[in-house]
């Protein structure tokens, strides 16, 4: 090892890579007939880190590390309550997708096509949460896009390539990582065609967007502006291949049950036919019978439906499921609020009758699991406002009267119980 300092009688040594002399660098390390300086070593380490990050995507998705469908399902169970069939369908589809990516380099006569996913279910049934959990489990870049904000290129609004730009932003513009990420497109049903017949006028937020999405979903080279840039003609773009990006599209598809029912009732005619009345059939049961022709009649173009071969339907969450959602998942709402209260050194108890009241209120509002937080937040608002200034409170108890707005939380002091807001 040669130090920066050296006598004039010594032969001057140079880095074999950058050409700097030993006096221009801090350290010069000698090898067999070559030298390398500390600056070149730092540069090498940076290159290795960048390449390792890109290779890490492939390494994390190698066969040995890729969780099996059962393992994927087990992890989904920790965060998502109910929707058992949808979780099984998703687990198999995601496993097959990343297994396919692993075998892309192998030459084979059989080419495996991509299994993009369509999730159909009411608001608050867990569509977005399922997609988020999958991305976190697989450690891949993930982005949520709202289909209602998209328009055809050239019109006011976001064009579909903005989705890929957001995906790049989420992985610090590492193209290799982005090309193996997951894109969740929400409200896909809101860009359905306005009628069964192709329109003679431009439908820039409906069928036009579906056509633009089609190219992205099936695989294309998307041109994305550089980091922090906006699109303009004289600009170099980042090229992102969307062929191996997994697209998950979700929507409530209000009215699809009627389309399915109309079709099934037409076929269920005859002496031996057993036709249930509309009242007897559960909405989730009807949705499970969805066929491509139903989605076409609803307003999706056939080409886009063909690129979403895996269809998973989610049912409405009942009272029991909503109560479980409040307490069972790893990041359950009750656990979150208990942690917030624990930061004030106060124990929070939400009684079973209160949980039931929260679930019933969410069902009345038709908000599903999505509405649970606002109900609890509203019930706890006053006590969370007062708690930091109250002295000696050790526990807060919430019952059904608090949830319904007919009572106030019970505060347990170190000495005696007291109702919040009372003097």
Curated annotation (Swiss-Prot):
Protein's job: ATP-dependent specificity component of the Clp protease. It directs the protease to specific substrates. Can perform chaperone functions in the absence of ClpP.
Protein's UniProt keywords contain RNA-binding: no
Organism: Burkholderia pseudomallei (strain K96243)
Residues annotated to bind ATP: 122-129
Pfam families in the cross-refs: AAA_2, ClpB_D2-small, zf-C4_ClpX
PROSITE patterns, per the entry: CLPX_ZB (PS51902)
Name this polypeptide is given: ATP-dependent Clp protease ATP-binding subunit ClpX
InterPro entries listed in its UniProt record: AAA+_ATPase (IPR003593), ATP-dep_Clp_protease_ClpX (IPR050052), ATPase_AAA_core (IPR003959), Clp_ATPase_C (IPR019489), Clp_protease_ATP-bd_su_ClpX (IPR004487), ClpX_bact (IPR046425), P-loop_NTPase (IPR027417), Znf_CppX_C4 (IPR010603)
Biological process (GO), any one: proteolysis involved in protein catabolic process
